[in-house]
């Protein structure tokens, strides 16, 4: 049998056993970024399928980013610290866009790297993680992998984070993960509520860090919303994470960032992967950040398609949570797994299951209007097979308008 590098080193495969906290600690400050994965988690996707499962921008990067990518190939042989634009240029572009100084910004390979680093920085066997249920899973998965306790606080009946219960759970915690707008429920809390929450946690548990994930902030239309960046600048151990994977259409390029006080950002930098950006992604990101008109157009496009898709479900009699993102969370009264499988057989890919609401709710990402019209027909067909058409509706009215 051929000798592989893995067998030569005697290293177990990632699926063979979980990495223990002792193993991680023994590696010192190495960038421990492994995540458990299996082939089943990433099935082959048919080219013809409409992909409404991962909250991606269906149009991809804007024209400025595409032009920058083409020009950047001349520097593809350079490390991203030496290319032009460089990683330093990207930090400066983010700082200008957000209204902070470059020292208030740190970069990540998508915001996922930063979420995992936050758990490593602030969590421990005696300092638990607080998160909502359901919410984005990466922080709790990293905590479980490292043997850090997790306290999951159920969302309320409208899918909003229960800030009162989360504040109570935050006492003696290492880290609170606050996703606003929340994935998968798509709901948000206004600026005042977030500010009051931060002030309370800082008062009652001053050593607890607060991570406010704003991955979907570019899609928000609620006038009561405001970014938490000012809170991150005001308070130590409070920070905001964002990504260019959503509105900027750069999910495959893995560009994310965090904003906070310089000392807080230094903590992330100690855990960061060396060269956690590539020179092509840096060039595209800088160009995108300098093209705010493209993001405004993307927000308008998503708002129109989101409203259309909301009507598809409400016309069928289903409750849709108040979406402030590029996806919907819908009470379909049946399992997300079964709905996903029925849609997939018809060429529509929708979101994964989100415990503890996986028996009743599904997440559907927003594509183009054309994609949502086609998906609407399939959704009506799939749900119609499991629930009667609302009284007074004809079979024609079940088709999206």
Feature map (PLM): residue ranges:
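Active-site pre-lysine segment of PLP-dependent enzymes
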Residues: 161-171, 184-210, 214-247, 263
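N-terminal export signals
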Residues: 1-29
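Conserved PLP-anchoring active-site segment centered on the Schiff-base-forming lysine
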Residues: 121-142
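Conserved PLP-binding catalytic core of the aspartate aminotransferase-like
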Residues: 155-157, 302-303, 312-346, 362
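N-terminal small-domain helix-loop-helix segment of the aminotransferase-like
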Residues: 27-110, 117
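PLP-dependent enzyme catalytic core of the Aspartate aminotransferase-like
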Residues: 342-346, 351, 355-401
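PLP-dependent aminotransferase class I/II
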Residues: 62, 237-321
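Short acidic capping loops at alpha-helix termini that bridge into adjacent secondary structure
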Residues: 101-105, 127-128, 207, 214, ...
């Amino acid at each position: 049998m051929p000798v592989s590098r893995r067998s030569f080193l005697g290293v177990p495969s990632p699926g063979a056993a979980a990495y223990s906290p002792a193993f991680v600690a023994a590696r010192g400050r190495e960038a421990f970024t492994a995540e458990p994965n299996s082939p089943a988690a990433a099935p082959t996707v048919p080219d013809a399928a409409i992909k409404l499962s991962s909250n991606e921008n269906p149009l991809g990067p804007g024209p400025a980013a595409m032009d920058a990518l083409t020009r950047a190939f001349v520097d593809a042989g350079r490390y991203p610290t030496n290319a032009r634009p460089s990683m330093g240029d990207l930090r400066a572009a983010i700082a200008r866009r957000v209204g902070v100084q470059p020292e208030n910004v740190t970069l990540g390979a998508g915001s996922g790297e930063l979420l995992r680093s936050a758990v490593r920085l602030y969590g421990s066997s005696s300092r638990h993680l607080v998160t909502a249920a359901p919410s984005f899973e990466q922080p709790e998965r990293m905590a479980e992998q490292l043997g850090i306790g997790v306290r999951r606080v159920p969302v309320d009946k409208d899918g909003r984070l229960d800030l009162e219960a989360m504040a109570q759970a935050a006492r003696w915690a290492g880290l609170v993960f606050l996703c606003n707008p929340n994935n998968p429920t798509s709901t948000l809390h206004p600026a005042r509520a977030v500010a009051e929450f931060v002030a309370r946690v800082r008062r009652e548990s001053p050593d607890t860090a607060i991570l406010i994930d704003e991955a979907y902030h570019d899609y928000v239309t609620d006038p009561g919303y405001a970014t938490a960046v000012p809170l991150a600048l005001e308070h130590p151990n409070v920070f905001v994470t964002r990504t260019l994977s959503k509105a900027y259409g750069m999910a495959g390029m893995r560009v994310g960032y965090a904003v906070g006080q310089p000392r807080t950002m230094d903590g992330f930098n100690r855990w960061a992967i060396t060269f956690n950006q590539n020179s092509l992604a840096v060039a595209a990101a800088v160009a995108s950040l300098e093209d705010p008109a493209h993001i405004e157009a993307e927000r308008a496009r998503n708002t129109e398609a989101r409203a259309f898709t909301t009507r598809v479900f409400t016309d069928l009699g289903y409750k849709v949570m108040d979406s402030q993102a590029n996806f919907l969370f819908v009470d379909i009264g049946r399992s997300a797994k079964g709905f996903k499988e029925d849609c997939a057989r018809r060429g529509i890919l929708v979101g994964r299951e989100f415990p503890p609401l996986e028996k009743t709710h599904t997440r559907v990402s927003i594509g183009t209007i054309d994609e949502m019209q086609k998906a609407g027909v399939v959704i009506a067909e799939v749900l119609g097979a499991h629930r009667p058409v609302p009284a007074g509706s004809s079979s024609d009215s079940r088709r999206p308008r």
